[in-house]
Design a protein with these regions (language model features):
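N-terminal Rossmann-like dinucleotide-binding module
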Residues: 1-52
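Beta-loop-alpha module in the N-terminal Rossmann-like domain of NAD(P)-dependent dehydrogenases
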Residues: 52-116
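Hydrophobic residues in well-ordered beta-strands that form the structural core
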Residues: 98-99, 124-126, 255
Length: 345
């Protein structure tokens, strides 16, 4: 059975992974060892004690509390320091690594991560709840069986208010790293590989404070089959929304992903011949994602499969290109692709 080490006790590690794993350990027998989850926070930002969490003051101390050969490491540190922490984790003998999305924040970090994985024989998997979502599975089936004919276009909207975290922490430096990795991975799964056709980002402004590149992100893709897709993520929106719209040859589909762990239900609306049907269903995608990874590791695999890792690599490549395109500016000029979202205080 497998032990758990969570590295990085911020929003993802402490706020999402710990409670989801605590539930999964009681729901999925035969995979998880009867041992507390061990957590380490390299940034020393979280000292909250929980009954189901044992906090170690260093990675070396965590190694002494666990068996590295039977431990899954959840790497929940910010993208900018991920390669450095991965190197330290690997040096301590851990090899099963479950990484928060995105796999890397840029191409240099991606190359470093993949090189470490090869040299240290790491079994990498990426936390990608949308790829394990019931809604995604239904969408893949609908596109594949051509129930509504061929896909004409797809758009993904990812809105949420992220003021406090963007103003108080530097865990992310680009809106392309917050919600967009979910959407790009989903689009690659649904429609196949793609080329970037446009990108822009927005600064977040609250009163006199500006957080560069954290107001929102927009990108456009052209897939190999000729289908166009778009992603729009507004991190200053007043409400949460995670929506996908498929324009089909014989109708349309609107899907709504669960917007938080407090209400894990998704829904979709299918319109055909002027008639719309709506269905609501349970969709605990993060639990499904983590248990899938643990089952893969328990069976001796890499947690997700080589194909999934390739999809995550391609996601990083497209997002890195989007960041560079959004930052393009003529000499001496302003950013032509950058908007500013301004909010009074």
């Amino acid at each position: 059975m497998l032990y758990t080490l969570i590295v990085g006790l911020g929003r993802s590690g402490l706020g999402l992974h710990v409670p989801v794993l605590s539930r999964a350990r009681s729901q999925v027998p035969g995979i998880f060892a009867d041992h507390p989850i061990v957590g380490v926070d390299p940034g020393d930002t979280a000292r909250a004690e929980r009954r189901d969490l044992l906090i170690a003051d260093s990675l070396r101390r965590a190694r002494d509390l666990l068996e590295p050969a039977r431990t899954v490491v959840h790497l929940c540190t910010p993208p900018a320091v991920r390669a450095e922490v991965l190197r330290e984790v690997a040096a301590l003998g851990f090899s099963r690594i479950l990484m928060e999305k995105p796999l890397a924040g840029d191409l240099d970090t991606l190359r470093c991560v993949l090189r470490l994985a090869r040299e240290q024989e790491l079994r990498l998997a990426v936390v990608a709840p949308w790829l394990h979502s019931t809604l995604t599975r239904r969408l893949v089936q609908l596109v594949g069986n051509r129930r509504l004919g061929a896909v004409r276009s797809v758009s993904v909207t990812q809105h949420k208010p992220r003021f406090r975290r963007s103003l108080s922490t530097g865990s992310h430096t680009s809106a392309f790293d917050v919600e967009a990795p979910h959407a790009v991975g989903l689009l690659l799964r649904l429609l196949g590989d793609a080329q970037l056709r446009g990108a822009r980002c927005a600064d977040l402004r609250v009163g006199t404070t500006t957080v560069p590149d954290m107001g929102g992100a927009h990108l456009e893709l052209l897939h190999t089959g000729g289908i166009r897709s778009a992603v729009l993520s507004d991190l200053s929106a007043p409400v949460r929304q995670r929506r996908i719209v498929l324009g089909m040859e014989d109708g349309s589909v609107v899907g709504h992903y669960a917007v938080g762990q407090d209400d894990d239900f998704a829904q979709w609306e299918i319109t055909r011949d002027g008639h719309t049907t709506r269905e609501v269903f349970r969709d605990d995608s993060l639990t499904a994602c983590l248990t899938h990874a643990y089952r893969g590791y328990a069976e001796g695999g890499d947690g997700t499969g080589a194909g999934d890792l390739g999809l995550h690599v391609r996601t990083v490549e497209l997002l890195d290109e989007a960041k560079r395109l959004a930052d393009l500016s003529p000499a001496g000029g302003t950013h032509p692709h950058k908007e500013a979202l301004s909010h009074g205080r």
